[in-house]
Amino acid sequence: MSVFKRNGHDEAPPIDPAATKAINRLIEMPRAEFEQLVVDLYCALGHTARRTGGLGDRDFDIVIVAKTGQHWIVQCKQWRGAVGESVVREFYAAMLREHATQGAIITTARFTPKAAQLAQGKSIHLYDGPAFLQALQRIKGTLVLDTDEHG
């Protein structure tokens, strides 16, 4: 499931001003639009993905049937502050409940060291803002959000 390549979880690369601006746009976009952007990325990679919909924060936002037939779930977090271990713990419980073979938490922010540590050894992939932007650039071929309007 590691479709958004990253050089580890410990050291984050510096963020340039254009990336900071793009991350702010991701944070400000409507939740459904952000989730759909994630769905579109997985679909571009040949997987089948759909939003779960509904109001309020859930343990997961997207269900994926991988090209291999595996069942994955994804949680999206449009946060400015770091994502902590409680989010990872709740997400892992959802993975077990849903019988998901893989899971990903995608955020516009960062992950705390404890969150990253908790995800280690589990089938949970963590993608922070810079890693998600890199995926957008690599998979979609553009920053996607590098114009003044994103809607």
Place the predicted regions along the sequence by residue.
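Mixed-charge (Asp/Glu-Lys/Arg
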Residues: 1-58, 63-151
